[in-house]
C-alpha cells in the first residue's frame, strides 16, 4: 500500500487527488471536534462509556468518536448509507426509477443522486431528533427549551449533509469512494482509544493476557484472510474468432473473463449492518423498558450480542452480496458484448446459452463470497460472546471495514496509474 502511494505521488494529477482527499479528511476531523451547544459532553461521555459495547458504541466508532462528544458530525455517514440502501431498493421495486437508472444515462444518475440527497436529509432529521430525545431523556442537556432543541437538531442535520457533500467531493475529485474513505478515517481515528482501553483492562485485570493475545491474533488472521480473498477470482476462458480484413487476419486470441470472489467489497457488510442496527438504534434512543415487559424482551432479542441479531445480520450480508453482484456484473450485457466483439466461451453458443452459463458461475462465486463475508463478519461477534469480550465484536467489524476500504482504495490508485500510463503511451 505504501509503495502504491509513493508511485502515485510521483504523478502530478494523482498527487493533487491525494492532497485533496487528505484536506477533506482534515476538515472531517476538525468538524468531529466541534460540539453542538447546550450539551453536557462529560455526562454524555460517561453515559455512552457504559454502553460502549452496544449499538451506540458501534455508532461512535463509525463516526470517529463524534457521536460520544455530540459534535456537528455526530451522525456521520449513517444517514447517507441508509438513504442509499432505500433508494437502491426502490430503484428495483419502482419501474420509473429503474428506467431512470438504466436508460437515463448521466442525467438519470444525477436525478437518482439528487433523490438520495433528499432522502439523506430526511433520515438525518429523524436521527437528529432521536439523538436529541436520547440526551433529553437522560438529563444530558443544559437547556431543554424549544430554541435549544432546534439548534441541536439543525446542527446534526447540517453536519450530516456536509459529511455527505465531502464524501461526494472525494469521489469526484479525490481517490476512491468518498463515503467509504470517510468511514475508514473515522474508524481508524478510534484505534488509539481502543488500544488504550485494552491496555487499561490488562492493567486492572479486567482482561486476561490470553484474551489480549487472542484478540491480536484474531485481528492479524482477519487481515490476512481479507487480503487473500480480495485477490481471489474465477476466470472463465474466452476465445475470439479469427476474421480477415483485407490481407490481414485479426482475432483468434485466447483471453479470460475474471469474476472476483468478493465482487462487492465491504459494501454488503456496511449496508447489512445499517439495516440490522435499525431496531437496536430505535430501542437505544427510547427510555429503557422495565424488566418482564414485551419491550424488554424485544430489546434483548435484537441486541447486537443476541443470536437473533447475528442470524439476521448474516442473512442481510448474503442478500446484499447478491444484490450488488447482479448490479455490477450483468450476464446478458457481458454476453452481448462478447458476441459483438466476436468472442465466445468454448462449449457454449453465443447469446442466451452464454448468458445462462455466466449467470450460473456468478451465482456460485457470489454464494461463496457472500458466505465468506458473513462468516468473517459474524466470527468476531461469536468469539466476543463466547469469551465474554464484547469489545471484540465492535473491533472485528471495524477491522473488516478498514482493511476492505484500504484494499479498494489501493486498487483505485493502481487502476488510475495504469490508465495514465496507457494515456501517456497513446499521446
Region roles according to the model:
Residues 1-427:
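N-terminal cationic and glycine-rich segments that engage phosphates or anionic surfaces
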Amino acid at each position: 500500500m505504501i509503495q502504491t502511494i509513493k508511485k502515485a505521488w510521483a504523478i502530478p494529477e494523482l498527487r493533487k487527488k491525494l492532497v485533496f482527499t487528505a484536506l477533506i479528511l482534515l476538515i472531517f476531523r476538525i468538524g468531529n471536534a466541534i460540539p453542538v451547544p447546550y450539551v453536557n459532553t462529560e455526562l454524555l461521555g460517561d453515559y455512552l462509556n457504559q454502553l460502549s459495547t452496544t449499538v451506540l458504541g458501534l455508532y461512535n466508532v463509525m463516526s470517529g468518536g463524534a457521536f460520544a462528544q455530540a459534535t456537528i458530525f455526530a451522525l456521520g455517514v449513517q444517514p447517507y448509507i441508509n438513504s442509499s440502501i432505500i433508494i437502491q431498493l426502490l430503484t428495483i421495486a419502482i419501474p420509473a426509477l429503474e428506467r431512470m437508472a438504466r436508460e437515463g444515462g448521466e442525467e438519470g444518475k444525477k436525478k437518482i443522486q439528487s433523490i438520495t440527497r433528499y432522502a439523506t436529509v430526511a433520515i438525518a432529521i429523524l436521527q437528529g431528533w432521536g439523538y436529541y430525545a436520547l440526551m433529553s431523556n437522560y438529563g444530558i442537556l443544559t437547556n431543554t427549551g424549544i430554541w435549544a432543541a432546534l439548534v441541536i437538531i439543525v446542527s446534526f442535520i447540517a453536519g450530516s449533509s456536509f459529511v455527505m457533500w465531502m464524501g461526494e467531493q472525494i469521489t469526484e475529485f479525490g481517490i476512491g469512494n468518498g463515503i467509504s474513505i470517510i468511514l475508514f478515517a473515522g474508524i481508524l481515528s478510534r484505534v488509539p482509544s481502543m488500544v488504550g482501553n485494552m491496555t487499561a483492562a490488562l492493567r486492572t485485570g479486567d482482561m486476561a493476557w490470553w484474551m489480549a493475545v487472542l484478540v491480536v491474533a484474531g485481528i492479524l488472521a482477519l487481515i490476512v484472510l481479507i487480503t487473500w480473498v480480495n485477490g481471489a477470482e474465477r476466470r472463465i476462458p474466452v476465445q475470439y474468432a479469427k476474421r480477415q480484413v483485407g490481407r490481414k487476419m485479426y482475432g483468434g486470441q485466447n483471453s479470460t473473463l475474471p469474476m472476483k470472489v468478493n465482487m462487492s467489497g465491504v459494501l454488503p457488510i456496511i449496508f447489512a449492518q445499517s439495516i440490522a442496527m435499525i431496531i437496536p438504534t430505535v430501542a437505544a434512543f427510547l427510555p429503557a423498558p422495565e424488566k418482564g415487559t414485551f419491550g424488554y424482551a424485544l430489546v434483548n432479542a435484537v441486541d447486537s450480542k443476541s443470536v437473533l441479531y447475528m442470524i439476521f445480520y448474516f442473512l442481510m450480508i448474503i442478500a446484499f452480496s447478491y444484490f450488488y453482484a447482479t448490479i455490477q456484473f450483468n450476464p446478458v450485457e457481458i454476453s452481448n458484448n462478447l458476441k459483438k466483439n466476436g468472442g465466445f466461451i468454448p462449449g457454449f453458443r453465443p447469446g442466451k446459452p452464454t448468458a445462462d452459463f455466466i449467470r450460473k458461475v456468478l451465482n456460485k462465486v457470489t454464494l461463496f463470497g457472500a458466505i465468506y463475508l458473513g462468516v468473517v463478519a459474524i466470527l468476531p461477534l461469536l468469539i466476543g460472546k463466547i469469551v465474554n469480550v464484547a469489545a471484540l465484536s465492535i473491533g472485528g467489524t471495524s477491522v473488516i471495514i478498514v482493511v476492505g476500504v484500504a484494499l479498494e482504495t489501493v486498487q483505485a490508485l493502481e487502476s488510475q496509474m495504469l490508465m495514465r500510463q496507457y494515456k501517456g503511451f497513446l499521446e
